[in-house]
């Protein structure tokens, strides 16, 4: 039987040893160290317990050849005398007190590693990729600085050269395909992938010259730097399913079909609904999605409202009730409507009966109307100030110029006020399959993909400022894609923003103490609030 033995030493210390009973006698297996204080004794006892529970370490300690004792050289013999000079007794060496040699956030790392494994990413078999993904979740930084973040998480980081080799592996073969497949498997097992959400964003580079990928194009931030266009497909909860990048001058509307097609081919998915915002609304886009047997829900533009709602305006004027929904038609191209405004009843869209139209759903909200009116009032005030010469500015909305004189466009203001509170949606899903309320609810799930983009551009800093080549950018986006999946899963389990989770868990520091040549790491005391977060993330999978 193996046990821990405490023995007083001649120097007044307490030796901690691991021993066993063999043939009725005690046999020392390993000498752990000598303690001079209660604190040091506690450290050595904990170290001994760890050695006893880890046979591999104990075997190494037992089989290691003990270092020979260091003996000081004696002085050469001097002349003989009748009485030898007094010789000082050898000094008793005492090890110094215990010292803290490091502290880290390994509790946080263990929690994120558990989530990474639950998503199936551990089957990729690449520990360096895993560390780069988790480092980006915790603190986005350059590849060169990732080692510092990993060290702070209690990891021994790979060398910079190894990290670069990992990035090369990521862009070769089917690495991103494997990541996307694992994301799909997780999403399909834990949620609903019959409806997916798509959106695009731009990531700019502070460089002077364009190349084949980084080009100057349309930027919502009005930047003139070379950029790339990134498309992201997520499920209705915002969990990432597909990512792709395009040339910076590529129209956003021309990115949706390649991403959707790649997703379908990879996972053999045929029947699904694609939701996108009004920026994806182009006649060609919708036609191609329909020809690919895909169902879609996209936001409509306000300029379509007078045509789509012609019947309502004829029979009811501009009067709407809060929550009112109008299910009607919208022209596929142009302004010619198949809706007969002379009929009071709105037509029910049928693809065979209305080949030149899509189904349009318009909803009125009093809350939205109040917000729209507030915006219109400000715009009208600005326009009147410009017309009155009180304010010099670029021509604002509702101001027209006639013979060099600015005038207020009263007709445009009236048309705008007639449409306050309205929001439109275009779809090719018949009412028999999806009612108007579900169409509206599905579209409003788009905030999840918008939130994912905000996470990737802020919390994960997706902008690859240190990447220069196309392969490096693609590898960077693969890491961001996996990091977004981990972050989304953490948020889903805790109900907290990933930034909040990191702010609460990263300060939980484990301390490593060295004493008598031995090192032992002690976990932090975890307050109840942080323990609740850990339990939500991994249950009892993390041992402290």
Labelled PLM ranges:
Residues 3, 13-15, 25-26, 112-544:
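Anion-binding and metal-coordination hotspots
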Residues 44, 63, 85, 332, ...:
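Low-complexity, intrinsically disordered/propeptide-like segments
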Residues 4-53:
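Short, surface-exposed polybasic/aromatic micro-patch for ligand or macromolecular engagement
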Residues 49, 53-56, 168, 487:
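Generic short alpha-helical segment signal, independent of protein family or function
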Residues 55-154:
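Extended, charge-enriched "interface" segments that sit outside catalytic cores
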